[in-house]
Amino acid sequence: MPRVQFRLAGLIAICVATWPAPAEARLVVDRVVVRGATDVTTRVLAARMHLYSGDPVDFAILGAAEQRLIESDLFSSVRVFIDLPTDEAVRRMYLDENTYPVAVIVEAVGKHSWFVFPTASFGSGDWAGGVVYANQNLIGRDVQLISAGQIGQSRSYAFVGYRDPLVVGAPLTYSMSALYRREQIRLFENHGMVLQVPTIVAGGDCQIGWVLSPHTRAFLGLSARYQTVNPAEDLASGAIPLPYNSRSGRIFLLQFQFQYDDTRAQEGLRQGILLFLKNEVSDRYWASDFDYSKFETRVELYGHYWWNYPSLILKMVLNYPTSDHGVPVTEMLRIGGSALRGYLANEFHGDTLFSAQAEDQAVLLRLRLPWTQVRFNVAAAIFVDAATLLDRHPGGTTVPPPDTLPPPVRSKLDDIHASFGGGVRLILPGVVIPALKIDVGYGIDVRDVAVTVSIAGGGIM
């Protein structure tokens, strides 16, 4: 009996080894044909789809290519297919052993690629206004250009940035930007401004990244800026000057960044998950005039049930000096205003930040803009914000100023600032940033109300 079993097993093994393998896909890409109203070049489309001349084609590959184009956010509608009857396509893909070149057809309607819009914000003891130009498909090459300018009570700037989200022929991305900013660094005590420090920052940065998946990217970068710090002014009468790093000089940073983002906003209301990690290091070893390390992590969760869109944003930033040259005053952590509603703009400062923002938006109305086909949402929101920002290294260096008390090791109850309130949003479909946002928040520990109004986010930085 065992001998019969061995013979049967041997016959099965021989049959498996000699059985003809199923035919592989025999349709290959000949060219990409574009139909419809889009100015995206054929070369860019092929790179986005990961389909090049000579690559095999089947229904799974076509479906994956179409999904990649949808995720590019360049099209209002898109379809990827081959111009063959279904039965003929199946025969050539899976049954016929001959090779057939075929045209891959992309039928698409592109989104309007460029925008010019005003930005503004006022309330919480500050105001600013500016304009932004953004183009997410410059000359049809799937590269992005953004430029912005702002004039404000405490911050004015000019900014230009260029980004290639996916290099043709490689899973790479790169970006570069330049910035000029004048800012009054305000320091507060007991819900009132003590002094302000005039500063100027000019420079730029560049990054190169790896596109690990449609939602996942990792970056390495270099930032080079020069900071000028002028003498403090507007010292409040009878106030004791707060310590800060008054050093001017070069800020050279090595950067690492990781991001996972599968959020979407078809109606302008976000859904999905965003994970963000970033580490920046400045050191005199590479000719920087400052020594510090900054680590930031952020988690953003956006949901949807019925007509509600709840969200939760958790953030942690550690910004520690590594020598007596310390952290530049312009890189000091600050919070208040839109990031901690119910308080003055940038009311709190320090080097160890933990914050949370919980919000629920409910769509009340869906209306149409006059004389257009564009619809927008009117939403109401309720929110709770909380944050603690410790100053473990007063003055931003490892050498504490004279007569300074030792900083706390961990947060006490008095170090936690919380607020609650509500607001209204006007939201355009497909645009993540609300066109108009009004929030009224009550700061619990300061027992005060702050109103914040922003148009198009109030600016890009």
Task: Briefly describe each language-model feature range.
Residues R3-L11:
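Sec-dependent signal peptide recognition
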Residues T18-P22:
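N-terminal signal peptide c-region/cleavage motif recognized by signal peptidases
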Residues E24-F122, V132, I146-L166, A202, ...:
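Periplasmic polypeptide-binding modules associated with outer-membrane biogenesis and secretion
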Residues A46, L187-N190, D234, H393-T397:
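Short acidic, glycine/proline-rich loop/turn micro-motifs
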Residues M49, D73, I273-M461:
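C-terminal transmembrane beta-barrel domains of outer membrane proteins
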Residues R79, N98-T263, I273, M332-S338, ...:
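Gram-negative/organellar outer-membrane beta-barrel architecture
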Residues Y260-E267, V363-R368:
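Conserved helix-loop functional segments at active or binding sites
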